[in-house]
């Protein structure tokens, strides 16, 4: 018999006693939107219809700790017995020598308690298979759960990314680049329940279609973690060329990033988003020193999330490979910062010097306001 449903287990939601029902409701909505299917909930479990494609998609939904394809049957011993035998047969091979029965019941009126179920179905397996019991390190775990309406039998458990459901912790406007760090940082925020909206600065014709294509490919990946990801593309060419006119060229990147933050600050506040986020990693490049971060982030009073601040690069790469963003980030394409960077960028910029140079750019704030309005007019 084929599997009828997929049983879904919550992540940290079981610890959130006070707001548990709200978190579960948000998770249920997220699963429905990403899978485009009906979600049933029962006690501390959720169920969706079984489809092979769902097994991959459920691995990336924040708030889910694990899930299992399950056989569903009536809550009668003879029915459960048949499913246990079939599921065991399906999951044993020449290397399977030991087993363990794991029983659980939310229906306390069922005729056997959990210990009695373990003994009953353990005896059944011993009679029908050449297997031995091993409760510490079995080759095969046979799970039996008795719910309010049905019983469920399964052997396989797939693990998801855990965390909290997206939208349970607010929103952030994320400064997205085509590099390795920024996409990983965004997904780490999603895992903590943040709904992430994206702001990406492009500079045509200096950045080509490959750059935009990379961003759209990243959007497809983000949609595995959160439904309906929005990426706002900002044509920054005019301002980038304008900043190139300053007298101290070493400050070009610092002034550009200060400008990014002013634009992000205004957009976030107009959209009632309470935080700005990025993929900054301390000391990795000139714009990611403490002095640079102070100089740049002074342009907003919003909370700034830097989830990768103290990470090792190899750990970021490993996670990017797991999330399928690394393969996209490493596609060759032109990046604004690379094209714009001076030979020797300042690594310890000061706010006073940056403000002095910005006085040379009389129209920069006007140009930034134009970009803000263009983004807000996007659907």
From Swiss-Prot:
Give one Pfam family: ThiI
Q: Which residues form the THUMP domain?
A: 52-157
Respond yes or no to whether keyword Transferase is given for this record. Answer: yes
Q: Which SUPFAM superfamilies does the protein's record reference?
A: Adenine nucleotide alpha hydrolases-like, THUMP domain-like
Enzyme Commission number, as recorded: 2.8.1.4
Q: In which pathway does it act?
A: Cofactor biosynthesis; thiamine diphosphate biosynthesis
**Which keywords accompany this UniProt record?**
ATP-binding, Cytoplasm, Nucleotide-binding, RNA-binding, Thiamine biosynthesis, Transferase, tRNA-binding
Q: Which Gene3D superfamilies match?
A: 3.30.2130.30, HUPs
Q: Which reaction does it catalyse?
A: [ThiI sulfur-carrier protein]-S-sulfanyl-L-cysteine + a uridine in tRNA + 2 reduced [2Fe-2S]-[ferredoxin] + ATP + H(+) = [ThiI sulfur-carrier protein]-L-cysteine + a 4-thiouridine in tRNA + 2 oxidized [2Fe-2S]-[ferredoxin] + AMP + diphosphate; [ThiS sulfur-carrier protein]-C-terminal Gly-Gly-AMP + S-sulfanyl-L-cysteinyl-[cysteine desulfurase] + AH2 = [ThiS sulfur-carrier protein]-C-terminal-Gly-aminoethanethioate + L-cysteinyl-[cysteine desulfurase] + A + AMP + 2 H(+)
* Signal peptide span: none
Which annotated residues bind ATP?
175-176, 257, 279, 288
| Compartments in which it is found | Cytoplasm
Supply one GO molecular-function term. Answer: tRNA-uracil-4 sulfurtransferase activity
> Per the record's keyword annotation, is Transferase included, yes or no?
yes
* GO terms for cellular component: cytosol
Q: Which GO BP terms, alphabetically?
A: thiamine biosynthetic process; thiamine diphosphate biosynthetic process; thiazole biosynthetic process; tRNA 4-thiouridine biosynthesis
Please name the top-level EC class of this enzyme. transferase
Task: State the HAMAP family in the record.
Answer: ThiI
What does the UniProt record say this protein does?
Catalyzes the ATP-dependent transfer of a sulfur to tRNA to produce 4-thiouridine in position 8 of tRNAs, which functions as a near-UV photosensor. Also catalyzes the transfer of sulfur to the sulfur carrier protein ThiS, forming ThiS-thiocarboxylate. This is a step in the synthesis of thiazole, in the thiamine biosynthesis pathway. The sulfur is donated as persulfide by IscS.
To which protein family does this belong?
Belongs to the ThiI family.
Checking NCBIfam families in the record gives: tRNA uracil 4-sulfurtransferase ThiI
Q: What is this protein called?
A: Probable tRNA sulfurtransferase
The UniProt gene name for this protein comes to thiI
């Amino acid at each position: 018999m084929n599997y009828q449903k997929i049983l879904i287990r919550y992540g940290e939601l079981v610890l959130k006693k006070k707001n548990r029902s709200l978190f579960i409701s948000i998770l249920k909505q997220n699963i429905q939107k990403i899978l485009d299917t009906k979600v049933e909930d029962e006690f501390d479990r959720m169920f969706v219809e079984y489809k092979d494609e769902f097994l991959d998609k459920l691995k990336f939904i924040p708030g889910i700790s694990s899930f299992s394809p399950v056989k569903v049957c009536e809550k009668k011993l003879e029915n459960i017995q048949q499913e246990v035998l079939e599921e065991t047969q399906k999951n044993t091979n020449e290397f399977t020598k030991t087993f363990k029965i794991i029983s659980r019941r939310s229906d306390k009126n069922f005729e056997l308690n959990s210990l009695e179920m373990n003994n009953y179905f353990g005896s059944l397996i011993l009679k029908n298979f050449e297997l031995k019991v091993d409760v510490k390190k079995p080759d095969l775990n046979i799970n039996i759960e008795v719910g309010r309406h049905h019983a469920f039998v399964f052997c396989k458990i797939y693990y998801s990314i855990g965390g909290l459901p997206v939208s349970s912790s607010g929103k952030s406007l994320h400064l997205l680049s085509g590099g390795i760090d920024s996409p990983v940082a965004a997904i780490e925020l999603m895992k903590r329940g943040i709904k992430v909206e994206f702001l990406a600065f492009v500079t045509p014709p200096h950045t080509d279609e490959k750059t935009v294509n990379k961003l759209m490919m990243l959007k497809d990946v983000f949609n595995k973690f959160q439904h309906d990801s929005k990426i706002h593309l900002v044509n920054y060419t005019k301002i980038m060329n304008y900043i190139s006119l300053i007298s101290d060229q070493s400050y070009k990147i610092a002034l550009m990033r200060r400008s990014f933050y002013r634009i992000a600050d205004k957009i976030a506040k107009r959209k009632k988003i309470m935080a700005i986020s990025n993929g900054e990693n301390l000391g990795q490049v000139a714009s990611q020193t403490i002095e640079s971060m102070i100089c740049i982030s002074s342009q907003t009073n919003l909370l700034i999330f830097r989830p990768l601040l103290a990470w090792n690069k190899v750990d970021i790469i490993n996670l990017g490979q797991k999330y399928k963003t690394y393969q996209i980030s490493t596609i060759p394409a032109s990046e604004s910062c690379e094209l714009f960077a001076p030979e020797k960028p300042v690594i310890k910029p000061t706010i006073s010097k940056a403000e002095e140079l910005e006085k040379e750019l009389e129209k920069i704030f006007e140009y930034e306001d134009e970009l803000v309005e263009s983004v807000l007019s996007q659907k």
